[in-house]
Amino acid sequence: MAFSDLTSRTVHLYDNWIKDADPRVEDWLLMSSPLPQTILLGFYVYFVTSLGPKLMENRKPFELKKAMITYNFFIVLFSVYMCYEFVMSGWGIGYSFRCDIVDYSRSPTALRMARTCWLYYFSKFIELLDTIFFVLRKKNSQVTFLHVFHHTIMPWTWWFGVKFAAGGLGTFHALLNTAVHVVMYSYYGLSALGPAYQKYLWWKKYLTSLQLVQFVIVAIHISQFFFMEDCKYQFPVFACIIMSYSFMFLLLFLHFWYRAYTKGQRLPKTVKNGTCKNKDN
């Protein structure tokens, strides 16, 4: 009886919570419930931390050079497209970069922003291949807590962003992240091409700095919300989450920077058989 009562209360709470969801995205892939993505991400964590390494234990590493070249440059092009769409659906045509609320209308611009948010969300599932490539190539030392946590938490939390607030000030970090990914995955793609391209990769050391700057800019932007008395942004909880994430990842990447560069405990060279070692964002 107690379990049945708890279940009914849980269902009631879920129904009350989900009624505020954006009806425009209800029928989009993976958007009906958080359960499918939770199962997918749970299996991802299990595969990259346990099942995958066990399956590869007595096997030779896969040679995935062509696959990684194709994948990395695909992400570059996809990121360019998403960045452009974020600009053309709000950030370059009317957003103030301060208190930008979500437009829930079905106007072409509002729907374009919602679709771009979903594309960004879906891109995070594509990027799970980063870790799967590590596992298949037996580069298990690269499957770090920072890497797996980042690749898991981003799509999971972005489901809620798309479901409830596909637009507005909560999407600025996505715009910035797509721009950063253009640079990062360009580097990864060039690295995968082999040693002949090493002379063009002198800017490797600036990648972590770029990531750190990204988190600082996101924190500065979202912090404005807490100092604007009349901002009508519909989901303040997302502003709190974004602020928390920006500081959390800033600290994690600062720790990485300190360990890899300041203390001299640098990770192995970036390119070896066409892979990038420091792929944590």
UniProtKB/Swiss-Prot annotation:
Keyword ATP-binding carried by entry: no
Pathway annotation from the record: Lipid metabolism; fatty acid biosynthesis
Motif (Di-lysine motif): 277-281
Superkingdom of the source species: Eukaryota
CC terms in the record's Gene Ontology section: endoplasmic reticulum; endoplasmic reticulum membrane
Lumenal-side segments: 2-27, 94-115, 163-171, 228-236
Active site: H150 (nucleophile)
Record-linked Pfam families: ELO
Reactions catalysed according to its record: a very-long-chain acyl-CoA + malonyl-CoA + H(+) = a very-long-chain 3-oxoacyl-CoA + CO2 + CoA; eicosanoyl-CoA + malonyl-CoA + H(+) = 3-oxodocosanoyl-CoA + CO2 + CoA; (5Z,8Z,11Z,14Z)-eicosatetraenoyl-CoA + malonyl-CoA + H(+) = (7Z,10Z,13Z,16Z)-3-oxodocosatetraenoyl-CoA + CO2 + CoA; (6Z,9Z,12Z)-octadecatrienoyl-CoA + malonyl-CoA + H(+) = (8Z,11Z,14Z)-3-oxoeicosatrienoyl-CoA + CO2 + CoA
Motif (HxxHH motif): 147-151
Subunit structure: Homodimer. Interacts with TECR.
Role, per record: Catalyzes the first and rate-limiting reaction of the four reactions that constitute the long-chain fatty acids elongation cycle. This endoplasmic reticulum-bound enzymatic process allows the addition of 2 carbons to the chain of long- and very long-chain fatty acids (VLCFAs) per cycle. Condensing enzyme with higher activity toward C18 acyl-CoAs, especially C18:3(n-3) acyl-CoAs and C18:3(n-6)-CoAs. Also active toward C20:4-, C18:0-, C18:1-, C18:2- and C16:0-CoAs, and weakly toward C20:0-CoA. Little or no activity toward C22:0-, C24:0-, or C26:0-CoAs.
Family: Belongs to the ELO family. ELOVL7 subfamily.
Annotated PANTHER family: ELONGATION OF VERY LONG CHAIN FATTY ACIDS PROTEIN 7 (PTHR11157:SF118), FATTY ACID ACYL TRANSFERASE-RELATED (PTHR11157)
Name this polypeptide is given: Very long chain fatty acid elongase 7
Organism name: Homo sapiens (Human)
Lineage: Eukaryota, Metazoa, Chordata, Craniata, Vertebrata
Gene assigned in the entry: ELOVL7
